[in-house]
UniProtKB/Swiss-Prot annotation:
Cofactor: pyridoxal 5'-phosphate
Top-level enzyme category: lyase
Name this protein carries in UniProt: Glutamate decarboxylase 1
Gene Ontology MF annotations: glutamate decarboxylase activity; identical protein binding; pyridoxal phosphate binding
Organism lineage string: Eukaryota, Metazoa, Chordata, Craniata, Vertebrata
Modified residues (Phosphoserine): S78
Length: 594
């Protein structure tokens, strides 16, 4: 705290005091309250509270009111407020003559570092503000060749010699300028959308810490956060809090791959040392609507894509259990060994939920590993209203759950949850002596890195943990319920309009709403190969116009023999009914002349 100069009366009354300490002690309530005003709100209130113990009620009220008024008058985002000695105040700085070598750890580099980072924060805050501003574009689209050739001083080529910090700041601005604002309320293109401010703060701090998740030794708090959060997620799935395991991975595709590795190790542990040649010819089962990562994992892990058997789905995209059992029996008759079934809770395109209870019955009957890919639908477990759609998930051996989708956590944040403790460790452990020494001074069971197939592992947990603390489980529940309500609103708005046609009948189970826009030229035209071919070209044309205008973004795709259709997904808590209305109007505007 800064020292205060006592008044003359105070000086006379302290004539016999120690001259080395007298001037360090403010002697009036006003002086002390001035000191309190320079502190954080929490500490300042404590100081004021201490002063009030022997003061009158009138004086107490005056002191606290003065402190609160002073605190509330401060601009919380002001750099002038961050340090009372002014080190973090913005000053005019000529960055054209400054380079990376002038920043910390350079000698006398603190001031330049502060000014540079304040400029970066200014860029970031402007971007955040514009992201939530509906009058701004979702994207400023340019073709690859335009960006590669350079845009108004924005050059992607790397140079041999250092460029000034002024140019680096320009590059920071332009990188955001020409990117896509995935947090914009009218961005509906992917399953991962939104820009959560608490999560953003967590990611800033994560990058600043710049640590690795392989041992407690170098990431003590993050390792404990991960264990606590994974335990909570397993409980929400419906497993015993004492059992189970899990780890955060780079994404749902890797989490799904972990599940196949765990299943293979559980039934055939010798594969770890002897390879696939030592085990029978194994087959995996997944639905024809499941995520392509199951086939990709089959290829990467040595099963081969021919041994990833696709199960038929009904018109809503759900696995037909009878076809699963038929294909299991067919595989056994051909000499294959069925190993693993993947059920999807929230398919990528239709948002369908496979009948997990019936699939679990079949897996138990034939002793197969059941995995539930709830990358997209796992968030619904947080909702008392919607979690019934994942009924039976507690019977799974493993679950993929991506908080970076429905829960709005910033990319990347995916978890693989395993019901049986020890399988991930046994499957992946290599006991690298330079990392996982058994004779450390702490409990080495907290060195979780050997469960992962990676060595270096990004800290994905902090932003998620911080968001959960800020929102609570109830906050996530409300957020998810709102997104599903918006999907119901969209469905109700277009289902009976002649310019739209639903891909399948019935209300959506998830926030996926799949539909065709029918231009005037195709309305009332009977179904035929020619009409389907023309309809197939409608969605891509509208999407191209949409991107050129930059007003909104929504995805499209074919499915089976169906022509290209729009797949609307809602996972951004910032979206409202007005944004849904805008999307419909924009599709009509862009498609009216097709």
């Amino acid at each position: 705290m800064a020292s205060s100069t006592p008044s003359s009366s105070a000086t006379s009354s302290n004539a016999g005091a120690d001259p080395n300490t007298t001037n360090l002690r403010p002697t009036t309530y006003d002086t002390w309250c001035g000191v309190a005003h320079g502190c954080t709100r929490k500490l300042g209130l404590k100081i004021c509270g201490f002063l009030q113990r022997t003061n009158s009620l009138e004086e107490k009220s005056r002191l606290v009111s003065a402190f609160k008024e002073r605190q509330s008058s401060k601009n919380l985002l002001s750099c002038e407020n961050s340090d009372k000695d002014g080190r973090f105040r913005r000053t005019e700085t000529d960055f054209s003559n400054l380079f990376a070598r002038d920043l910390l750890p350079a000698k006398n580099g603190e001031e330049q570092t502060v000014q540079f980072l304040l400029e970066v924060v200014d860029i970031l805050l402007n971007y955040v503000r514009k992201t939530f501003d509906r009058s701004t574009k979702v994207l400023d689209f340019h073709h690859p060749h335009q960006l590669l050739e350079g845009m108004e001083g924005f050059n992607l080529e790397l140079s041999d010699h250092p460029e000034s910090l002024e140019q680096i700041l320009v590059d920071c601005r332009d990188t955001l300028k020409y990117g896509v604002r995935t947090g914009h309320p009218r961005f509906f293109n992917q399953l991962s959308t939104g820009l959560d401010i608490i999560g953003l703060a967590g990611e800033w701090l994560t990058s600043t810490a710049n640590t690795n998740m392989f041992t407690y030794e170098i990431a003590p708090v993050f390792v404990l956060m991960e264990q606590i959060t994974l335990k909570k997620m397993r409980e929400i799935v419906g497993w015993s809090s004492k059992d189970g395991d899990g780890i955060f991975s780079p994404g749902g595709a890797i989490s799904n791959m972990y599940s196949i590795m765990a299943a293979r190790f559980k039934y055939f542990p010798e594969v770890k040392t002897k390879g696939m040649a030592a085990v029978p010819k194994l087959v995996l089962f997944t639905s024809e609507h499941s995520h392509y990562s199951i086939k990709k994992a089959g290829a990467a892990l040595g099963f081969g894509t021919d041994n990833v058997i696709l199960i038929k789905c009904n018109e809503r995209g759900k696995i037909i259990p009878a076809d699963l059992e038929t294909k299991i029996l067919e595989a056994k008759q051909k000499g294959y060994v069925p190993l693993y079934v993947n059920a999807t809770a929230g398919t990528t395109v239709y948002g369908a939920f496979d009948p997990i209870q019936e699939i679990a019955d079949i897996c138990e009957k034939y002793n197969l590993w059941l995995h539930v890919d709830a990358a997209w639908g796992g968030g619904l477990l947080m909702s008392q209203k919607h979690r019934h759609k994942l009924s039976g998930i507690e019977r799974a051996n493993s679950v993929t759950w991506n908080p970076h989708k429905m829960m709005g956590v910033l990319l990347q944040c995916s978890a693989i949850l395993v019901k049986e403790k020890g399988i991930l460790q046994g499957c992946n452990q290599m006991c690298a002596g330079y990392l996982f020494q058994p004779d450390k001074q702490y409990d080495v069971s907290y060195d979780t890195g050997d469960k992962a197939i990676q060595c270096g592992r990004h800290v994905d947990i902090f932003k998620f943990w911080l968001m959960w603390k800020a929102k609570g489980t109830v906050g996530f529940e409300n957020q998810i319920n709102k997104c599903l309500e918006l999907a119901e609103y969209l469905y109700a708005k277009i289902k009976n309009r002649e310019e739209f046609e639903m891909v399948f009948d019935g209300e959506p189970e998830h926030t996926n709403v799949c539909f065709w826009y029918i231009p005037q030229s195709l309305r009332g035209v009977p179904d035929s190969p020619e009409r389907r071919e023309k309809l197939h070209r409608v969605a891509p044309k509208i999407k191209a116009l949409m991107m050129e205008s930059g007003t909104t973004m929504v995805g499209y795709q074919p499915q089976g023999d169906k022509a290209n259709f729009f797949r609307m997904v809602i996972s951004n808590p910032a979206a409202t009914q007005s944004d849904i209305d805008f999307l419909i109007e924009e599709i009509e505007r862009l498609g009216q002349d097709l």
